[in-house]
């Protein structure tokens, strides 16, 4: 599962930022007033056509298109959605960036979690809170999952509507654990996981765990150790992020615990792609793996042995630590006509509705962003036969509302990840000390943020 935006795309984003923002150091939430209401669409002549861009592929794209086809059928003669699948999130952002220059941004953009800072900074979106207030017959924001709302909020104001969520899980080959005499109850903490990984390797010869060198996992290790990933306030207050925070003692300890597993030979190197971890796990080449809940279907389709999924282990109390959600969210363009904005909001409301969320979640494995479907009998029946989905939902539902679990919000995220990954690879291989790796990553990431903010300010 690819999360990162490529360096080439990140550079393209920077080139187009100048002049997009009035200030690079403070946040300015989209206006919560003046949003168009139902009359804007009702008074429009003919069919209101809107554009919808996304970066999903495979079964996820198919499930999304099925919902959009349903929306078009229900709104025939009034609204028509023209969908454009961009192939990947990197391609989506590259095309979106080009559209900024000629003011042709799509009516609705569905983009991934780490692009949120950039999409917010370019100020081409309409406030979801304003649209909900002006269109009370559509989406009820209080139905959205709190963890999703927090991730897509700045200064306590919602800036995009979550479409789908993922959460980090620990997948476990129960047969290999039994051979090694390891109880799953010992895997609730990071220290317990490390001890189990070594014990499994010693007892069975199979590596205890696989973790892809995707920076999402270092963000999770940070949040579950009770620390911020960027400052101030993870970039979510009135001031935007100006530095990373990679060197807090409990954070370094969490990183070092995972690195210790690898240096002891109890971890399997699967590179940077989480899909490689799925392949290794299904082949019995690792007893455990960290992976996104979004791979649940792939794991189910490729494994032939009993396994379970467990919540991501913590290394700090829940009073200050928790996991960070991933996924994607929908952004409504402020460059669209009032009729298009209302039509776009109706599409967003439809896709985020309980019925649509149930269909999309069950087709893809993503955690639904709408909590109103939880009491549905059909949904309860589905979860009873899909325990991994239940574990993922429970983790998202129960995550503590603390600053660490909100995640870092910055338009420089892709560059930060590019700075962090090679340093962690060096630390995990033992070619560089953890302290030096984090110092080097900090220097590079802080420079990336500085460069981004300079471009954003138009200097």
Give the location of each predicted region.
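Short, low-complexity disordered leader/linker segments with a strong preference
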Residues: 1-50, 73, 446-459
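Extracytoplasmic/periplasmic substrate-recognition and gating elements
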Residues: 46, 180, 256, 260-266, ...
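Extracytoplasmic "Venus flytrap"/periplasmic binding protein-like
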Residues: 70, 74-144, 179-181, 280, ...
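Hinge/lid segment of periplasmic solute-binding proteins
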Residues: 113-168, 221-224, 309-310
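Short, solvent-exposed loop/beta-turn-alpha elements that line the ligand-binding surface or hinge
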Residues: 129-144, 186, 228-253, 301-302, ...
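Extracytoplasmic/periplasmic solute-binding protein
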Residues: 154-155, 159-163, 168, 191-243, ...
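Glycine-centered hinge/linker elements that transmit conformational signals in sensory
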Residues: 197, 240-270
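C-terminal capping/gating helix-and-loop segments adjacent to ligand/active sites or protein-protein/ligand interfaces
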Residues: 390-444
């Amino acid at each position: 599962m690819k999360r990162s935006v490529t360096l080439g795309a990140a550079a393209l984003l920077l080139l187009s930022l100048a002049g997009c923002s009035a200030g690079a150091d403070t946040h300015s939430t989209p206006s919560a007033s003046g949003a168009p209401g139902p009359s804007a669409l009702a008074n429009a002549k003919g069919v209101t056509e809107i554009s919808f861009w996304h970066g999903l592929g495979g079964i996820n794209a198919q499930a999304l298109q099925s919902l959009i086809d349903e929306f078009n059928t229900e709104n025939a003669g009034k609204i028509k959605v023209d969908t454009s699948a961009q192939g990947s999130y990197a391609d989506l952002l590259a095309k979106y960036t080009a559209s900024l220059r000629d003011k042709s941004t799509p009516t609705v953009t569905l983009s991934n979690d780490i692009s949120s800072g950039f999409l917010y900074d370019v100020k081409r979106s309409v406030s979801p809170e304003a649209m909900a207030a002006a269109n009370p017959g559509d989406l009820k924001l209080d139905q959205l999952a709190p963890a999703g709302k927090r991730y897509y909020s700045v200064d306590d104001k919602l800036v995009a509507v979550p479409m789908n969520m993922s959460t980090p899980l620990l997948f476990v080959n129960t047969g290999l654990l039994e051979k090694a005499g390891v109880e799953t109850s010992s895997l609730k903490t990071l220290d317990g996981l490390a001890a189990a990984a070594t014990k499994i390797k010693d007892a069975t010869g199979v590596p205890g765990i696989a973790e892809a060198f995707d920076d999402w996992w270092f963000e999770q290790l940070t949040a579950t150790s009770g620390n911020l990933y960027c400052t101030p306030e993870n970039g979510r207050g009135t001031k935007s992020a100006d530095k990373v925070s990679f060197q807090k003692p409990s954070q370094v300890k969490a990183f070092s615990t995972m690195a210790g597993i690898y240096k002891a030979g109890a971890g399997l190197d699967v590179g940077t792609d989480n899909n490689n971890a799925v392949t290794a796990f299904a082949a019995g080449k690792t007893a455990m793996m960290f992976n996104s809940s979004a791979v649940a279907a792939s794991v189910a389709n490729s494994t032939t042995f009993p396994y379970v999924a467990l919540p991501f282990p913590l290394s700090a109390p829940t009073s200050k630590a928790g996991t960070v959600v991933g996924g994607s969210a929908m952004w409504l363009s402020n460059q669209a006509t009032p009729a298009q904005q209302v039509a776009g909001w109706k599409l967003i409301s439809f896709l985020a509705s309980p019925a649509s969320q149930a269909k999309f979640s069950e087709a893809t494995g993503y955690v639904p962003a709408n909590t109103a479907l939880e009491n549905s009998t059909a949904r309860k029946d589905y979860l009873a036969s899909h325990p991994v989905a239940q574990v993922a939902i429970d983790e998202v539902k129960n995550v503590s509302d603390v600053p660490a679990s909100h995640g870092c919000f910055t338009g420089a995220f892709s560059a930060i990840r590019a700075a962090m990954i090679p340093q962690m690879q060096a630390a995990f291989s033992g070619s560089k000390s953890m302290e030096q790796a984090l110092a080097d990553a900090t220097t590079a990431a802080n420079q990336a943020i500085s460069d981004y903010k300079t471009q954003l300010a138009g200097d």
